């Protein structure tokens, strides 16, 4: 950029009484420019081009503010900003849902955004804790921490998810390689509805976008301790600091988490699902020159679960004898994940560019094996500890993205990019049938069937999206993405009698398949006023196709291809801010049609998922989100979601016969989700920002089903949480309790009847110091 075209932005930040505010963070959207105000409340930003910029201000104890400023190509008078106490005003919410920084209020997409403060207030430790906070979202697991997530009736039930999860820009490629634990979070964004244009494969239900805190010129850190019942211990810490000011930055955070099991194993009288794990997140950021940034990020998670599948056979057993089971095989799950990325960002005069290369690796195995019959019988166990070369998933991805430049005054803004991935999945698993196998109808005993698979998947994509200002109030959004994927799978089957050599039952066989998909988007946004936006969208998403695995059941042939699943969505939305940013109200209505629906079936006893394309699904509903600060210190939040997700056609095979399940409801999809929170904060000592805080939360989840025939169901129920304590600038002390009434409910169930209950009532104390 020509030096003569560079200009300077200056400004002053004050509070409601016109008192200058010190140490306010000032950030220019979609740039690496961040600075702080001095003791006089003044800030200065140099070396930028003339144009329109969004300036974001944030400071402890104050509601974040964002405002568009028009920077002229000459000396500019200082811009004045006023920040109000967080106790009386809602914050401006920044999101990167569309691959660039924007205000939530201005984006014509259904999004729930949670700030770092809200993540702490809700006490969110795991992605599944977002259930009902996000309208029409449900997430749960069978005790193995691999969450099944449903948004608007689009449900993840296989290792290729239908709801994509991104952490710091990296697609958590499958349930094998994603990290569900939450720590040191900057914000969480949940996009509802198909997001295929910008996010591609497996975003047909939506996207969970998680951003962790990165280091800046301001040194900061925290230490937090949580202790509670069930011997819950959670220790977390983080630090962010400049190594060389304006040049090199370092950040690190980590969590150690352990607890006793919620379940007791009556077979040995011991706690069953004891867990402990370590999660780490490390940043090294380098600014080699003006407008350039290089960021290295490494994440890891190492979990140990002493009883990975705390499940019982049937609903009656689950509720009549809650949190007790009887399993003779107590499998210990080792789950080790490493995710690393290298990002390069440049802000240019013609366009901004971002490149991100990422590597993901997960090795998960059971030692000793896990119980496959969920009973005290020595009948079925699942064995997969065959060394590090097996069940060790590896993924390489690269995204190259271009954006229209920041600050450029134009009626058109755009985003375009390419995406590449390669995935290697070497799997080996044995199903062992013990001396009691005959009691389950197995004609032989003391033998194993061994399935070996090697999968290689490679894909490329190109995408573009344009926002065009048609009039001063009307904006057109249009986008298109093309994805191509090649899948290869080798299968090999063996039979082995205990103490004898194995012999081949299925020779080494290979197959491949190619899949492609177009994902368009078309939308309109109309600005009703400065505080209200109306929008309408059409979007398409898809879940990739694949090849079936190997099972011992001859009716389930291996290497059978199944095609991609597609969702087409139409939605209308209205976003409003009222009463000087004290009241916000967002409303959405949607209609989604899914064709070529993938229906996964868990084949027993091998615990292998076989997928077929069968049927179509229609999902329709509405959503509402409300935030209100009626008086100083009091905040109310409410979310509501209604989903009617019904199969319009669904024919499956059961016991050798075709069964028509037309009219059945989608699984893992509550018909209603509702959440209400009320929090009161009393400012005790203003100079030290000491507040007394009391918070209550109410969750309601409607009826949901866990099998396609709708025979396994959970009736509607309520859950209540609370958080009470003291907050200050440098120290927080809180008592928290979740599921106060100890409500028993089904969190997860397999279609063959195995049931896992949701967490019982838990409580604890949290102490956090910030510096």
Segments (PLM) and residue ranges:
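N-terminal periplasmic accessory domains that precede
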Residues: 78-81, 127-130, 148-152, 166, ...
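Short acidic/polar hinge/loop motifs at secondary-structure boundaries
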Residues: 168-194, 280
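Membrane-embedded beta-barrel scaffold of Gram-negative outer-membrane proteins
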Residues: 343-348, 352-370, 527, 533-543, ...
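Gram-negative outer-membrane beta-barrel transporters
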Residues: 403, 417, 591-593, 612-705, ...
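Transmembrane beta-barrel wall of Gram-negative outer-membrane proteins
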Residues: 220-222, 227-259, 263, 267-306, ...
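C-terminal beta-signal and adjacent terminal beta-strands/loops
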Residues: 633-636, 698-707, 725-771
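Structural signature of Gram-negative outer-membrane beta-barrels, strongest in the C-terminal barrel
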Residues: 285-290, 402-405, 413, 418-421, ...
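Short, acidic, small-residue-rich periplasmic hinge/interaction motif at the N-terminus
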Residues: 14-19, 24-29, 58-62, 72-120
């Amino acid at each position: 950029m020509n030096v003569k075209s560079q200009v300077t932005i200056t400004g002053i930040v004050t509070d409601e009484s016109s008192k200058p505010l010190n140490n306010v963070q000032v950030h220019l959207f979609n740039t690496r420019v961040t600075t702080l105000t001095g003791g006089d409340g003044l800030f200065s930003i140099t070396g930028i081009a003339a144009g329109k910029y969004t300036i974001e201000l944030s400071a402890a104890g104050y509601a974040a503010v964002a405002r568009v400023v028009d920077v002229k190509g000459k000396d500019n008078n200082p811009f004045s900003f006023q920040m109000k106490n967080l106790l009386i005003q809602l914050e401006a919410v920044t999101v990167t849902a569309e691959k660039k920084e924007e205000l939530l209020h201005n984006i014509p997409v259904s999004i729930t955004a949670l700030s770092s403060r809200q993540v702490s207030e809700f006490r969110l430790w795991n992605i599944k804790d977002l259930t009902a906070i996000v309208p029409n979202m449900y997430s749960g697991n069978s005790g193995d921490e691999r969450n099944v997530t449903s948004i608007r009736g689009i449900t993840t039930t296989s290792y290729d998810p239908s709801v994509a999860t991104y952490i710091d820009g990296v697609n958590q490629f499958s349930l094998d390689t994603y990290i569900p634990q939450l720590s040191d979070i900057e914000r969480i964004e949940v996009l509802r509805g198909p997001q295929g244009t910008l996010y591609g494969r497996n975003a047909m239900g939506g996207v969970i976008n998680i951003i962790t805190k990165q280091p800046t010129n301001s040194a900061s850190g925290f230490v937090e301790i949580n202790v509670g019942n069930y011997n819950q211990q959670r220790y977390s810490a983080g630090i962010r600091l400049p190594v060389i000011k304006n040049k090199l930055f370092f950040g690190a955070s980590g969590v150690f988490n352990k607890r006793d099991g919620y379940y007791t194993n009556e077979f040995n009288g011991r706690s069953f699902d004891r867990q402990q794990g370590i999660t780490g997140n490390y940043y090294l950021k380098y600014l080699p020159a003006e407008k350039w940034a290089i960021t290295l990020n490494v994440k890891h998670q190492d979990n140990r679960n002493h009883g990975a599948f705390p499940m019982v056979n049937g609903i009656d057993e689950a509720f009549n004898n809650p949190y007790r089971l009887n399993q003779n095989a107590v499998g210990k799950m080792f789950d080790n994940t490493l995710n690393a990325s290298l990002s390069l960002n440049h802000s240019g005069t013609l366009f901004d560019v971002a490149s991100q290369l990422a590597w993901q690796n997960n090795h998960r195995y059971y030692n000793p094996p896990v119980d496959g019959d969920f009973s005290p019988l020595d009948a079925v166990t699942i064995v997969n500890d065959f060394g590090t070369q097996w069940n060790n998933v590896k993924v390489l991805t690269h995204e190259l993205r271009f954006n229209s430049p920041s600050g450029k005054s134009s009626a058109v803004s755009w985003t375009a990019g390419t995406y590449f991935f390669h995935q290697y999945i070497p799997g080996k698993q044995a199903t062992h049938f013990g001396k009691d196998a005959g009691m389950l109808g197995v004609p032989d005993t003391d033998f194993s069937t061994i399935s070996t698979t090697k999968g290689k998947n490679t894909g490329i994509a190109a995408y573009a999206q344009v926002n065009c200002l048609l009039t001063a109030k009307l904006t057109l959004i249009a986008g298109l993405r093309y994805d191509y994927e090649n899948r290869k799978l080798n299968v090999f089957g063996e039979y082995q009698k205990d103490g004898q050599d194995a012999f081949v039952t299925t020779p080494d066989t290979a197959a491949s398949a190619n899949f492609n998909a177009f994902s368009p988007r078309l939308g309109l946004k109309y600005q009703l006023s400065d505080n209200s936006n109306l929008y309408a969208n059409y979007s398409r998403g898809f879940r990739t196709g694949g090849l079936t695995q190997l099972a011992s059941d001859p009716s389930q042939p291996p290497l059978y291809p199944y095609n991609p699943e597609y969702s087409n969505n139409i939605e209308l939305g209205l976003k409003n801010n009222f009463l000087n940013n004290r009241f916000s109200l967002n409303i959405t209505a949607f209609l989604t049609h899914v064709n070529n629906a993938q229906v996964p079936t868990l084949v027993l006893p091998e615990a292998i998922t076989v997928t077929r394309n069968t049927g179509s699904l229609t999902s329709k509903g509405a959503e509402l989100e409300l935030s209100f600060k009626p008086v100083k210190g009091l905040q109310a939040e409410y979310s509501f979601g209604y989903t009617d997700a019904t199969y319009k056609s669904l024919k499956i095979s059961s016991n050798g016969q075709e069964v028509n399940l037309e009219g059945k409801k989608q699984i893992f999809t509550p018909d209603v989700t509702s959440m209400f929170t009320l929090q009161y904060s009393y400012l005790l000592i203003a100079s030290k920002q000491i507040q007394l805080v009391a918070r209550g939360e109410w969750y309601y989840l409607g009826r949901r089903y866990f099998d396609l025939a709708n025979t396994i169901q959970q009736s509607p129920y309520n859950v209540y949480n609370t958080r009470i304590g003291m907050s200050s600038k440098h120290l927080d002390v809180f008592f928290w309790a979740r599921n106060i009434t100890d409500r028993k409910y089904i969190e997860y169930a397999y279609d063959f009847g195995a049931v896992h209950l949701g967490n019982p009532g838990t409580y604890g104390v949290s102490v956090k110091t910030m510096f």
